[in-house]
Design a protein with these regions (language model features):
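A short, charged, amphipathic alpha-helix used as a generic interaction element across diverse proteins
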Residues: 55-73
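Local beta-strand/beta-hairpin segments that build beta-sheet-rich folds
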Residues: 22, 50-54
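Short intrinsically disordered terminal tails
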Residues: 1, 74-75
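Short aromatic-glycine-(Arg/Gly/Cys) micro-motifs in beta-strand/loop hairpins
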Residues: 27-51
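Negatively charged, low-complexity tracts enriched in Asp/Glu with abundant Ser/Thr
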Residues: 1-27
């Protein structure tokens, strides 16, 4: 799955209410985000103590991880 496909399948989901940000870095407690930085894709998580954790990789890998996280947050 590519980023544009992720945007399409999540267009009817209130991502902000789930604590998900697509296309820009997360900056609130308990949020997760996915964005491109140069040639790299980044998944960034902010925990309850405002610590930031990043995973970097290929677009498909990062998008797959964030989509899985979105599905878990919906439950």
């Amino acid at each position: 799955m590519k980023f544009n496909e992720l945007l399409e399948v999540t267009k009817d989901i209130d991502l902000e209410a789930l604590g998900v940000s697509l296309g820009k870095a997360a900056n609130r407690v308990e949020t997760i985000s996915c964005f491109q930085e140069g040639d790299e894709w980044v998944m960034q998580e902010v925990d309850d103590r405002q610590r930031v954790f990043e995973k970097r990789g290929k677009e498909e890998d990062i998008v797959r991880k964030i989509y899985g996280n979105i599905k878990l947050r919906i439950r």
